[in-house]
Structures are given as C-alpha cells and as structure tokens.
UniProtKB/Swiss-Prot annotation:
It comes from Rattus norvegicus. It holds the Pfam family FancD2. Belongs to the Fanconi anemia protein FANCD2 family. GO terms for cellular component: condensed chromosome; DNA repair complex; nucleus. The modification Phosphoserine is found at residues 222, 716, 1257, 1406, 1414. Residues 860-871 have a biased composition (Basic residues). Monoubiquitinated on Lys-561 during S phase and upon genotoxic stress by FANCL in complex with E2 ligases UBE2T or UBE2W. Deubiquitinated by USP1 as cells enter G2/M, or once DNA repair is completed. Monoubiquitination requires the joint intervention of the FANC core complex, including FANCA, FANCB, FANCC, FANCE, FANCF, FANCG, and FANCM, and proteins involved in cell cycle checkpoints and DNA repair, including RPA1, ATR, CHEK1 and BRCA1, and is mediated by FANCL/PHF9. Monoubiquitination prevents DNA release from the FANCI-FANCD2 complex. Phosphorylated on several sites including Ser-222 and Ser-1401 in response to genotoxic stress by ATM and/or ATR. Residues 248-359 are annotated as: Interaction with BRCA2. Required for maintenance of chromosomal stability. Promotes accurate and efficient pairing of homologs during meiosis. Involved in the repair of DNA double-strand breaks, both by homologous recombination and single-strand annealing. The FANCI-FANCD2 complex binds and scans double-stranded DNA (dsDNA) for DNA damage; this complex stalls at DNA junctions between double-stranded DNA and single-stranded DNA. May participate in S phase and G2 phase checkpoint activation upon DNA damage. The keyword RNA-binding does not apply. Residues 858-879, 1399-1451 are annotated as: Disordered. There is a cross-link at residue 561 (Glycyl lysine isopeptide (Lys-Gly) (interchain with G-Cter in ubiquitin)). It comes from the Eukaryota. This is Fanconi anemia group D2 protein homolog.
C-alpha cells in the first residue's frame, strides 16, 4: 500500500499568501531555464527522462507536444513496472518526482506536461479513443506516484495564482487543477480534500469560483460530507461565494438535515442577493426539497422572493423608451439584456423543477391555496399558477380548481392580473398557448366572474405579448365566437371590442381572422351580431386617410348581399349590420382645430355615405312590416347608445318625423273611411279634443286594411304599396322620440301631444258579446288590443322621465290604461287558444317563439276528465299551425302581419273560464325601459284639466294604485331575474336553435349589469315606502279590533293584488341583494348604498358606518315584516331575502337562529287557500322552507323529532282532509315533502359528524354516543312511518336515504363504538339493538319491492342489501376487537312485507332452513343483553336470507 503523503507544507494561510505574492513579483525569466530548440527532444539523462522514454513517451522542448508512442494504458503499466522493478525502489520514486520537478521549472515544459500528448500516427489507428491525456494526468493514474505528483502540483499553483492569463488564453492554475478531475482512483482523498480547501481559502475570487465548482469532479463520495461542512463555513464567512458553493451542494451527496440547515441560511439572505445570483440560489432551494418539507419551503420561498427583482425588466423597458426618444438608449442596452436573461434563467430553473418534481408543483399550489386574503396575494402567485398550468400536465385540474375558487372568493382581481402580466411578460410569453387554453377552459364555466377572468387572460396576453402571440389570441377568440356557447361567444366578442380600443392598429393586422366570423352569423343572437359588425366597422373606418379600405369594401358587399336576400333571417342580419356600420361612420368625433377644412370635407363625405346606406336599408325594408320594425328598433338603439354627428342626426330626425306624421297621425275631425265590422271611435284620449286642432292615431283603419287582405297573398309576396304598416307604429314612435330627445337634451315638448291623443278604435271591452263573436272578429279585436297595449307601453317609455306634474299625471293615466288593456287581453286570449299575436318587437330571438296556450288549464281539464282527448288534439293542432306560421321565415321574406287566427271558424262548444298567463306572450309585448320604474317615485299627482282657452277647468288627483304598482313590479322582477340571477343553461349544439331566456329583454341586455343595479338601488327608497304601506295594510287587516264591516270592505281581488305586490317587492329586494356581483371589489360601493337605504329606515345612518353594522340594521328592518306576511310565498321570499343578507355577514351565526324561528313560524301557520298544497309550485316552496328551517336550526335532530313525534301523530289521528294542528302545513298531500326533507337532512347531519379518536376524552365519547342515539331514534321513527304511509314516494325515500344512513353509520359511528364498547357497553348495545330493528324493516322493504316488481324501487335493493351485509361484518369485527367473538351469531330472517306478514311465495322450500324463527332469534337479543349485564361480554346480530337462499344481513 502506498504510504499517505504529508499534506501541503504551509505553516498557515498567511505564510502561503506571502509566498505566493513574492513569487508573483519575480519575473518569469528567473523562474525558468532557457528552453531548448523548438523541435528538439529532451535528452536529459535523468531517471525521469529515461524511464519515460523506456515506457513509450518522448519529451519535447519548446511549444511542441510530448509524444506518446504507445497506448495510454500500456504506458502507465510499463512505467509502473519499471518503477517497481527498479533496483533502488522505492527511492527511485523520489528521484523520478525530483526529475519531474526540475523539468517543470521551465514554464513551457510545465505547460507541455499539463497539455495533452501527441500520439504517433501508427499508434492512433489502434486506439479506441482519439482523446489523449496529458503527462501529468497519466502519472496521476499511477498509484505509487499520485501523492507526490499531487503535492508537487499544489506547490506549483501558488506561483501562478496572481498571474494574468497568457497570450493564448490559458490559465495555469485552472490547467493545473483540471489534472485532478475525474481520476480513476484517489489514493489519499482526505489529504487531497484538505489541500483543495486550503487552496480555495487563499485563491483570488475569480479562481475561488472555479476551484469550488470543480470539487465534485475532483473529490470522491467519501469526502462529500467533509467538503460540505467546510464549504458551509466558507459560505457564512464570504457571501460572494454563495452561488458557486450552492451550485456544488446540488452535486454533492449530503445529509438532508445538513441541506435543510443550509437552505435556512440561504433563505434568510434571499431578499438581499443580486438578481444574477437568484437562479442558482432558487435552484438549490428547490433541489433540496423533500416530500415532507416541500410545502413549508415553497411557502417561505414565495414570501422571500422580492418582487422588485421581477419588476426591473418592465422598469427598464419604460425607461428605455424614454431614453430612445432622447437618443440615449444605447448605454443601458447591455444591462437590460443581462437582467432579462437573469429573469428568464430564474424561471427556467423553476419550470424545470416543476416539470420533473410533482411534489414541488403540488406544494406551490397548496401554498397559494392557503392564502385567504386578497391583499396577501402577489403577482408571483398568479404567474406561478399560469406557469404550473403550462409546464406540469399532471396538475392542470388542480390549477383550474384553485383559480376558480380564488376568482369566486374575489382573491384574484383584475388589478392583480394586470400587474402579473406587466411584471412577468417575458416569462409568460413563452407559455402563451397554455394561457389561451386555460382561458378556453374558464370560458366554459357558468359563473360570469370566471368567464370574465378568462376574458382578461386573453386581453392582457394581447396587450403585453408580441405580434405572433397577438395573432394567436385573436385566433383563439374567433374560435370562441364560433363555438356556439352563448356565454362564451359574448365574452369573446367583448374582449375583441376591448382590444380594438386598446390597440386598433394591431387588430387591423388580424382583420382577416375576424372577417371569418361573418360565416356564422345565422346562429347568433342580435346582440352578438351587433358586436360583430361593430368590431368590423370600427376596424374598417378607423384607418388613417389614404390607407387601403378593403375592409370597408367587404363590409358593404356583405351587407348589400344580406339586405337583398329573400330569406327573412338574413335580411334582419343585414339590417343590424347596416345600422351598426352607419352608426360607426356617423359617430360624432372631436376633430383638431387646425384641420377644420379637411375634417369638414371628410364629414360631408361620410354624411353622404351614411344617408345613402340608410336609404338603401329603407328601400329594402319598406315593403316588409317586420323588417321595417326591426330597422326602426335598431336605429333607435343606435341613437340611444351613440352620439351621431349633428348633421346626420338632423337629417334622420326630420325624415322620421315626417314619415310618422304622414303614416299614422290624422286630424281629429277626419272621418275614418271603410267598411268596419265595429263602430269606430276616438278612444283613450286624456283630454277633450277640439275638432279643429286635435290629432288621433289612425290605428283601426290602417290595421283593418291589412287584416282584410288574404294571408296567402301577404306571405307569398311583398306588398307593392308603400303605406306604413301599423305593426311599425310602436317601433317608429320609439325612434322618433329618441331622435327628438337627443336633439333637445331630453325635452319632448315637440311630440307631447302623442301622450294624450286618442286612437281610432272600436270599443275593445268585449263584455257579453265575446261569446257571440266570430273567430275572425275575435282575432281582429285581440290584435287591436295588442297594438294599443304596445303603443301605450312605448308612450310610457317615452314620457316617464318628464318632470312636470301634468306630464306625470298623464303617464300614470296611461299606466292605468295598460292595466285595463291587460285584463281585456286575458279575456280575448282565453277564448282564442290558437291565436298568434302580431309581432311588434322583432329580432332573431323571437323568430321561433311559439306562444304557449295554457298548459295548466289543459292539465286541469284532463284531471277532471272533461274533453281531455279533444283538448289534447286541439293543442297539437295549434302547435302545428303556429309552427307553420313561424317557420315561413326560412323561405319567404315576410309573414302574416295581422296575427289573426289560422283557424277561421267559430268556436263551438263552451268551456269553463280559462286562465291565461300573459307571461307566455312576453315576446309580443314592447319592452319597458328601466327608466320607466322612476314612476315608483310618484306619490299623489295633481293633473290639471284645461279648457279650449288653456285655462284650468278642473283638477284631478292621480296616484299609483295597487294594480299599477303590481304591473311595474312584475316587470321589474322579471328584468332582475333575467339579468342578476345566473342562468345555468347547458351547452347546446351550434347548428340548433337555442331557446333564449332573453326574449323580451333585448334593450335590457344592452345595458351593463352594474348600471341596472345602480338604477334599482336608486329605487330602493320608494320601494321601501310601498313595502311599508303594504305592511301597514295587512297589519291593520289582521288587527283584532278591526270591525267585521271594515274587513268585509276588503275584496278578495284587493287582497290578492296587495299580497302580490308584497311578494314582488320581496322578490325584487332578494334579486338585488342576492346578486353575486356584490362580492367584486368594484361593486362594494353599490352594496353599501343599498344597505344604507334599508338601515336608514330604522334610524339615521352615519357616514362611514361599518358594513357589518349596516347588515345588522338591514336585517332587523326586514325581519320586522314577518308580522304582516299575507301568504306562504311572501314568507318564503322574506326568508330568502334575510338569507341573502346573512351570506354577506362575517358573523352569520348570530342571526341563524332567528331565521330558523321565522321558518318554523311559517310552517306552524295555517295559510288561506288550503287547496294550494296540491299545486306543484306550493310543494316546491314548502320543500325550500323546510330545508331552510332544518339547515338553520341549532339542533336538527331535535327539530326532526318534534315534527315526527308531534306533527305526524296529529296528522295520523286527524280526518282525511285535515292537517296537523301544530304544523298546519303538514297534510297528507305534503307528508311526502316533509318526509323526504327530514330523511335527507338526517343523513346530511350524521354524515358530517366526526368519528372521533380513542385519545378523545370520555366526555367527548359520551356526547358523541348521545348524539348518535338521538340520530338512530329519529331514523327509527321515520322508517316506521312507512307502515302508515306506504306510497311509492315514501318507500323510495326510505330505500335511498336508508342506505345512505347505514353507510354513514358504518363510516362515522362504528369507529366510535370500537373504542367505546368497553366503557359504555350498555349504551352501545342499546344503540345497536335500535338500529337492528330499523334494518329489519329495511329488509322487509326490499322484499316488498321485489314481490311487487316495482323497478323504480328494486333498483335500490342491491346497494341497500350490500350496505346491510357490510354492517353485519363490521359489528362482528367490533366484537372481535373487544374480545367478544362468542357473542356474535348468524341466523336466517324470513321475508316479510311492510306489515310483518310472511311472504309465502318466498318461503324457503327446505324445512331445515326455517328455524324457530330467526325473528325470535333476533328478538332474543334482549335476553342476551341481560346475560351480558350479568357479566358475559356477548352481543348478537342477525343475517337475513332472500328467496334465492343468498345471505342478506341486517343488524
């Protein structure tokens, strides 16, 4: 064995440093001999030279490489043998090394020995490799020479530590240390380690880095621990070596505890390190993570990473642009690129760790998931989620789930996302496809907040990424637009609109993608079509003058083609596109003052284009009432949304005014000409009209002219006449009044005569003559009523915001007319079941609408058994006729405008009074604007009646009555339900018509949800006034001191109207306060405003009052309404309203008991109209109310026991049609609802119980056992009720929730019984005995289901029996665990029905299988219990057997 060489002979580090400095000061000439000739061979006769030559290596002088004549391994073997066989061995080794030292005193010779040898050509072919080692490397491979050679090398290194690199770029210290790398064997690794560490401690900084990073390649595994310890000390002393030391730690085999200590040390310095050091530091931290420490390390790393390191590139980018503008940018270019490279390298390290270590990605997700506050989230969190989503395929679902939760909890907001993209755009740009894929996934959500987040991902990707990524973003958005998902299409179009505003020039580069959407217009809603044409028109007309206008040409071509189409749907698309494009062209834009002449010429040119386009639309639609109506409505929407150039607006207003006046307005003195079936009168005038200057809407003559035409002629070809159809009356007037309002800042004095002018009509009130009318006359009168009704709706829309008392009074009068006409409509529709009203509001959503006749009436008729078959046949015929009528738009350009019945014959046979719901005809009514509800502010209004000389002749007080209030509240409630309540519509096939819930709300959907909420908040004060008035009304009505005569004066209709107003007000309040948008930070101000209004009704609120206090006061205010609830539905909506407030509270538990108390009061109250429990709607409401009660009560089991123990026995003992006296809502019809909810809540409650552990205190065990005893007792009571109420719904609930209860018992209760059996033996046995009786009933129910062969029940039997068998085995396992194996026995259980009678058909054929009743064996449980009480630890359980002789068990 080779003796251990002494280590480098330095007295201390200072001595080494001094020697090195002295050597550095000496010139190289003094250190070297004169070199020999460049081509000469070293002929020194020393042992060193002779042995090398004899072994096959020739030393060369000068710059020539040493020549190796034999294979490297052969050379080492020959030299080793020569040394070992030398006569003076081992002294020859010292002579050899001394010769080497002498030879290498010359720098050129030393360098030759350190560089690779030259191999002779004849030897090269035989070698397996072309790599040739240096002489020193070859000598280090010989064990007997290695220690001396290493010592010599370390003595040589100090001579060159402070020398600069030679002209050929070779660093002698690096070259010397490189000889020690990758040695096959290290003779004395400890000595080598010591010398390396001493060298590192005195070397210059630049060499220290290289020496440290070389350690893993030099040292053996056995020295890794020692090296790590010394490097850790060096790390503390010299922070500048942090990067190389940590880089080495990643390559050494070190103890995890040691690495943890180093990680903690480095983590403390993380916030102060340089940016260029971060990649290596983060790499070390991530590589040192273990499964157990991953979450802790990642959470700390997330906290310590300083965001300033990442904001540097964006700041440089901003400053760079400023410098470029001054011509000073070049000086900072290198620094910018360096910082960018550091950022990219850092995240490459993170992405690499995430890609290959699932633990790290999961830990990062968990670390972000644990953050609860929005303020604690950083841009790095969002960036990491996006990076993990794009890098790790295994955690995509986890990232999606976490993002959804964070968005819904409002933790990740738009500002944070903006900061993320602006800060990390360099890194996120590389994962742009993954970001778009994530956005696509979020687009499929049903939550609008999640869809909005997906939209923002696309928006910011377009804003911060390069041109290629922008193209990808636009392509992805176009794909979403063509997907067919309504919410997805809307979101994508909104993003495209925002991108045009953000960067129109970049969007124009992608116009070719967007134009492709035009091929999918047929399947889109009107609002979506408007957005598409708005996008394309903005791109087309926002270009600089002189640029290519190919987009404009394409737009004109598409619109002209669609306008000229004979397919009505395409014509409507053309109208929407033309009007939208005209609005973009004619939009009023502020021009620079220095280009007045040029802008004037451009404006004149655009005005000509706009007028010609509008004239084209008018000419293409004037023969079609439907198309004309849509044209006017579209133009009205345009006027309302955009500010047109004054010149264009003036031309439009004048044209519309003249057309309307010529078409619809006649003098009062004009006598209608024509052969009308009814007398014509000027009806519904609000003032006495003078025969000289009064005006009338000429409705009947115009409509009768069209009504008299043959339907086939109207639908087969367009009318050649240019007379305006009365179907366009309302839409034409809407356009007219918006033009006038836009011109005169909302003043409508020019057209105020239209508010109170009468209409030429017959007497619309049918009276007794309704039955004697022909079907044709009924259709005529019904259509006239529809047109009049819609005319007044538009009149109210127009003048609702006028401020003068006179105008307000007239608007209220028109509102009363609307209520009256609504009642008349119901009378006509009740006797014309197949009637199709005239369309007065036309868009693509209403093309396929079929007005549904009263299905409830049909069901009632079938229930009574009267004319059931005929009724069904008539309904089918009606649907067929309506389908035919409404699908003609695919082949013809117009349809029958009159809306008369397709069955032109008198109705034969009399039916009972039919109830008609006007909600089915919503598509045929003109939409009320949101501004109409400002009428709710109206109190008592004095209307002045003037004489012919404009003097006051009389005054009349007008106020908003209950009927008018109900009319407004119904419409407002529908609007809020449509816009504020999320719709969970499922994805539909793209090429199928989508049933839209938005029919009749087209104007509403052109306003933002925030705008609508703001409007409703402004209405809260008047609505509270109305709510309190109704509250007082019902309180007075219920007062005991109210006389019988006073109560009799309140008619049933008045009571119903006031009750309906009460319910609608509560619905409106609930829709507003339950709006999910209040969770968004930007909407908190709206929520506070709403709560301030409610809270101020109790006492004066203060500025800056805490939100929790406002919620509490609002809750108290609304809770006071409980004493005046007039109906069951009102009570339920009040509960839902209070729950909506409770959800926004930080401490909801304080109010939960009040909710439970109110719910119980509603359940224990006898409501009027007792037959309502047969109504499905009432049943749904009762189900919701009972759920609210049981969910909010503090003791669910006690509440269930009260209902089953008090209410149900009262019901059982009561007459058939009676109810429980304690719970009047509990009847035989509603028992199933009570039973289902109680079983579900019982199962939910026990499922949420924790099983507990053996280490819990005895008190905890006793409490849990007591709770389970109550649960099993409730379960027992409920299960036994199926003996009394054995209908299918009850049995189905027993099977379904009985199995779930048994499964919950197995999971939650049996572990508790395992470690409670010994201490609470009696309680456990009592619990099992009670449960055994219940499972026996479940077994009987399984047999009952089989014998009756009811597949609806039998499908639950296998799962239930499986659970019962598992229970038997689990009980046996518990007994074995407690050393009571002998207490368990199995027997057979006979199949019996619900009443306990044996099922003979399933009786086992073998008499041996029938013991003396397993029932008796099961009941012997009691005697065995007594034996156990006497000291025997026994328990028993039973097992059942069905007809197939398979063992079924119950316990």
């Amino acid at each position: 064995m080779v003796s251990k060489r002494s280590r480098l002979d330095f007295e201390d580090k200072e001595t080494l440093a001094e020697d090195a400095s002295k050597i550095m000061k000496q010139p190289l000439s003094k250190l070297a001999k004169k070199s020999c000739g460049s081509h000469e061979v070293e002929e020194n006769g020393s042992v060193f030279v002779r042995l090398l030559k004899a072994s096959g290596l020739t030393l060369k002088t000068g710059d020539n490489q040493n020549q190796l004549g034999v294979d490297q391994i052969i050379f080492q073997r020959k030299l080793f043998q020569a040394l070992r066989k030398h006569p003076s061995y081992p002294k020859v080794i010292e002579e050899f090394v001394n010769g080497l030292e002498s030879y290498t005193e010359d720098i050129d010779s030393l360098r030759n020995c350190l560089l690779s040898c030259e191999r002779l050509q004849d030897e090269e072919a035989s070698m397996g490799t072309f790599y040739s080692k240096s002489l020193i490397k070859l000598l280090l491979g010989i064990d007997i020479l290695q220690p001396a050679i290493i010592k010599m090398l370390f003595e040589k290194v100090p001579q060159f530590l402070f020398e600069s690199e030679s002209r050929d770029g070779i660093s002698m210290p690096r070259l010397i240390i490189s000889q020690l790398k990758w040695l096959d064997r290290i003779v004395d690794s400890k000595d080598l380690t010591t010398q390396m560490m001493q060298l590192i401690s005195v070397a210059p900084v630049n060499l220290q880095h290289d020496f440290i990073t070389s350690l893993p390649e030099i040292l053996g595994d056995s020295q890794h621990a020692n090296v790590g310890k010394e490097l850790s000390e060096l790390l503390v002393q010299n922070t500048s070596l942090t990067v190389p030391i940590l880089d080495v730690f990643s390559s050494l085999r070190l103890d995890p505890n040691f690495l943890s200590e180093i990680r903690q040390l480095v983590m403390g310095k993380l916030s102060s390190v340089r940016l260029e050091d971060l990649p290596v530091i983060v790499k070390f931290i991530l590589h040192s993570v273990t499964d157990s420490t991953s979450l802790e390390v990642i959470a700390e790393l997330r906290e310590k990473l300083n965001v300033q390191h990442f904001t540097l590139p964006s700041r440089i980018q901003a400053s760079q642009s400023k410098l470029k503008s001054k011509g000073l940018a070049s000086s900072s270019g290198n620094q910018e690129n360096s910082d960018k490279d550091c950022i990219v390298l850092l995240f490459d390290v993170i992405k690499s760790a995430i890609r290959y270590e699932k633990t790290i990605s999961e830990a990062w997700i968990k670390a972000i998931e644990r953050i609860q506050s929005a303020a604690e989230h950083k841009a790095l969190d969002v960036a990491m989620l996006l990076i993990i989503y794009g890098t790790s395929t295994q955690t995509k679902k986890g990232v999606e789930r976490l993002l959804r939760n964070k968005i819904q909890s409002d933790c990740i907001q738009e500002q944070l996302l903006d900061s993320t993209f602006s800060t990390h755009c360099l890194v996120l740009k590389d994962i742009c496809p993954s970001i778009l894929l994530l956005a696509q996934t979020l687009f499929h959500s049903q939550d609008q907040r999640i869809i909005l987040f997906g939209s923002l991902l696309c928006k910011y990707a377009f804003k911060f990424f390069d041109t290629y990524c922008q193209q990808e973003v636009v392509g992805a958005l176009v794909t979403h637009v063509c997907s067919g998902n309504e919410a997805e299409v809307d979101a994508a179009l909104d993003v495209l609109l925002e991108l045009i505003v953000l960067n129109a020039s970049a969007m124009r580069l992608n116009a070719a993608f967007i134009k492709g959407i035009l091929d999918y217009l047929e399947n889109m809603s009107p609002q979506q079509i408007r957005k598409i044409f708005c996008i394309l028109s903005t791109l087309a007309f926002s270009q600089q003058p002189g640029t290519s206008n190919h987009i404009q040409d394409d737009m004109h071509l598409v619109i002209r083609k669609q306008l000229s189409s004979t397919v009505f749907k395409y014509k409507l698309i053309g109208i929407i596109g033309a009007v939208t494009m005209a609005g973009i062209m004619a939009e009023d834009r502020t021009m620079p003052s220095n280009s007045t002449q040029r802008s004037a010429s451009v404006s004149s040119e655009q005005h000509t284009q706009v007028t010609s386009l509008l004239q084209l639309v008018h000419s293409c639609t004037e023969h079609s009432p439907w198309a004309s109506s849509l044209y006017y409505d579209e133009f009205a929407n345009l006027i309302q949304e955009r500010k047109l150039a004054p010149k264009t607006l003036e031309w439009v207003a004048q044209t519309i005014f003249n057309d309307f006046q010529d078409a619809f307005v006649v003098d009062f003195c004009a006598v209608p000409e024509g052969d009308f079936p009814f007398p014509v009168k000027a009806l519904y005038g609000l003032e006495e009209c003078n025969t000289q200057d009064g005006i009338v809407i000429n409705l009947l003559p115009l409509f009768f002219q069209e009504f008299a035409k043959d339907v086939s002629q109207v639908t087969s070809q367009e009318s050649s006449q240019k007379s305006m159809s009365p179907l366009c009356l309302a839409s034409h007037f809407r356009l007219l009044r918006l033009c006038v309002a836009r011109q005169h800042n909302g003043n409508l004095d020019e057209i105020d005569a239209l508010l109170d002018c009468p209409l030429f009509l017959p007497d619309l009130e049918p009276g007794e003559k309704l039955e004697s009318m022909s079907a044709k006359d009924r259709s005529l009168m019904c259509s006239l009523t529809f047109l009049t009704f819609n005319w007044f709706r538009e009149v109210v829309n127009a003048f609702c915001q006028q401020t003068s008392p006179e105008m307000k009074g007239k608007v209220l009068s028109r509102l009363k007319d609307l209520v009256e006409l609504q009642e008349i409509l119901e009378k006509y529709l009740a006797v014309i079941p197949d009637y199709v009203p005239p369309f007065t509001s036309v868009d693509l959503d209403t093309l396929d609408v079929i007005p549904r006749s009263n299905s409830a009436v049909a069901a009632k008729s079938r229930h009574k058994g009267k004319t059931g078959g005929k009724k069904q046949k008539a309904d089918s015929s009606t649907a067929s006729c309506t389908d035919t009528l409404l699908t003609e738009d695919t082949s013809e350009c117009d349809v029958a405008p009159s809306g008369k019945s397709q069955v032109d014959k008198e109705s034969t046979g009399k039916e009972g009074k039919t109830f008609v719901s006007l909600q089915n005809y919503r598509a045929f009514f003109r939409e009320l604007d949101i501004e109409v509800f400002s009428i709710l502010h109206s109190g008592l209004v004095t209307k002045f009646i003037l004489d012919t000389e404009m003097h006051t002749e009389a005054t009349e007080v007008v106020q908003l009555g209950p009927a008018e209030l109900l009319f407004l509240l119904e419409d407002l409630s529908q609007k809020l339900e449509n816009r504020l309540t999320p719709s969970f519509t499922k994805r539909v096939c793209f090429f199928k018509n989508k049933g839209s819930r938005n029919i009749g709300f087209s104007h509403l959907h052109q306003r933002s949800v925030q705008d609508i909420v703001h409007c409703v908040v402004q209405l809260l004060t008047p609505m509270c006034n109305h709510l309190e008035n109704i509250h007082n009304f019902f309180q007075c009505l219920g007062a005991e001191n109210l006389s019988v005569n006073d109560k009799a004066r309140v008619t049933a209709q008045e009571h119903y109207t006031m009750s309906s107003c009460y319910q609608k007000l509560l619905q409106v309040f609930h829709a507003l306060l339950a709006w999910k948008g209040f969770t968004h930070q930007s909407n908190h101000r709206l929520l506070r405003s709403a709560l301030e209004v409610l809270a101020s009704r109790l006492k004066q609120t203060e500025e800056g009052q805490p939100l929790e206090e406002l919620l509490s006061q609002s809750f108290s205010y609304l809770q006071n309404l409980q004493h005046s609830i007039p109906s069951f539905q009102c009570g339920l909506y009040l509960l839902r309203l209070l729950m909506a407030l409770l959800e926004k509270s930080a401490v909801p538990t304080q109010k939960k008991e009040k909710l439970a108390s109110l719910a119980k009061q509603l359940l224990c109250r006898a409501w009027p109209h007792g037959d309502k429990e047969k109504n499905p709607t009432f049943n749904d409401h009762l189900h919701d109310l009972l759920c609210i009660y049981l969910e909010h009560t503090d003791n669910v089991l006690k509440a269930i026991e009260e209902i089953t123990g008090v209410g149900v026995p009262e019901l059982v003992n009561a007459p058939k049609d009676a109810s429980s006296s304690t719970f009047p809502t509990l009847t035989r019809h509603t028992f199933v609802i009570f039973f289902r909810v109680m079983m579900a809540e019982l199962e939910k409650t026990v499922k949420g119980l924790q099983a507990g552990t053996a280490t819990d205190s005895q008190q905890v065990h006793e409490e849990k056992l007591l709770y389970w005893n109550m649960a099993v007792r409730d379960f027992s009571i409920l299960i036994n009720l199926m003996k009394v109420f054995d209908s299918y719904p009850v049995l189905h609930v027993c099977l379904k929730y009985g199995r779930r209860f048994v499964e919950a018992f197995l999971k939650q209760c049996m572990p508790l019984l395992d470690f409670s059996f010994r201490k609470h033996r009696d309680d456990v046995l009592s619990l099992l005995q009670t449960l055994q009786l219940n499972t026996r009933l479940l077994h009987h129910l399984c047999g009952h289901s089989k014998i009756h062969q009811d597949t609806r029940l039998t499908k639950h039997v296998p799962l239930l029996k499986k659970s019962l068998e598992l229970l038997v085995c689990r009980v046996k396992a518990m007994l074995v665990l407690n050393n009571c194996r002998e207490a368990f026995w199995l027997g057979t259980l006979k199949n019996r029905d619900l009443q306990g009678e044996e099922i003979i058909s399933q009786h086992p054929s073998s008499p041996e299988n029938t013991s003396e009743d397993s029932e008796d064996g099961m009941t012997s449980y009691v005697s065995r219990n007594r034996a156990i009480e006497d000291g025997e630890d026994e328990a028993n359980d039973g097992q059942d057997r069905d007809s197939d002789e398979s063992d079924d068990s119950s316990s």
